[in-house]
């Protein structure tokens, strides 16, 4: 599978993941054919929650003015548009419209196979039906505002969301989730407790997510890599798909 094909799957998975959040939680959504914008009320200054995803570059170019008007109506001054690797024409359009390149995030992909994790003595791998402990692990790194939009999932997982926890002595030490769409598993919210770093627990979570997704019929996993997780994903065999470039519009 080519990098372009995997990036297309990553884009579709990111969009499906956001659409699910909008349907089941507090995210607001603005939609035009081929363009979707998301915003979280009460967190107008947290740019992470104000994001535009697109499938059609021409549609996005034509939507920039009404998109800006919608964000202003929400009281949002800053938002971002992730651009797929190689879409230089769209980047030029955004630059002319006042957007600025702010950061770069690697996209990564991995063909799946059945390789269940080998757990260290005294640890268990669990499949929780709620996200409370996975969110708690993520707050160590992103704070409460980074996962507040997922509060409705804290006590009940929606369909197509599958979580994994590594537990030791009744403590949740690492966890993460996958969002599965078609035969593609998107990997999100993988985190390890600060007390359990350098024990390989993040890799165990990933292998658990991979094996479970494969058993459910997924053939590939995709993700956007944080600096903290990038090395781990490479060790697990993920292939780099190029840099996703976040263009930001700041109107404040």
List where the protein language model places each region.
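Conserved active-site alpha-helix within GNAT-family acetyltransferase domains
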Residues: 87-101, 203, 227-244
């Amino acid at each position: 599978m080519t990098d372009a094909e995997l990036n297309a799957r990553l884009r579709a998975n990111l969009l499906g993941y956001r659409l699910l959040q909008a349907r089941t939680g507090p995210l607001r959504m603005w939609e035009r054919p081929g363009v979707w914008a998301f915003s979280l009320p009460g967190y107008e200054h947290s740019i992470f929650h104000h994001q535009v995803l697109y499938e059609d570059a021409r549609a996005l170019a034509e939507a920039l003015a009404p998109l800006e008007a919608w964000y202003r109506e929400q009281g949002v001054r800053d938002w971002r548009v992730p651009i797929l690797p190689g879409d230089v024409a769209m980047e030029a359009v955004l630059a002319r419209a006042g957007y600025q390149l702010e950061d770069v995030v690697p996209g990564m992909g991995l063909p799946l196979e059945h390789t269940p994790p080998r757990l260290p003595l005294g640890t268990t791998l669990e499949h929780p039906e709620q996200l409370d402990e996975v969110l708690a692990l993520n707050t160590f790194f992103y704070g409460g505002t980074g996962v507040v939009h997922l509060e409705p999932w804290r006590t009940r997982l929606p369909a197509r969301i599958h979580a994994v926890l590594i537990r030791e002595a009744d403590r949740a030490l690492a966890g993460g989730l996958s969002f599965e769409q078609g035969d593609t598993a998107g990997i999100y919210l993988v985190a390890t407790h600060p007390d359990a770093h350098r024990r390989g627990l993040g890799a165990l979570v990933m292998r658990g997510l991979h094996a479970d997704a494969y058993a459910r019929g997924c053939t590939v996993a995709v993700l956007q890599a944080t600096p903290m997780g990038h090395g781990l994903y490479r060790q697990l065999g993920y292939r780099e798909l190029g840099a996703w470039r976040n263009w930001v519009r700041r109107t404040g």
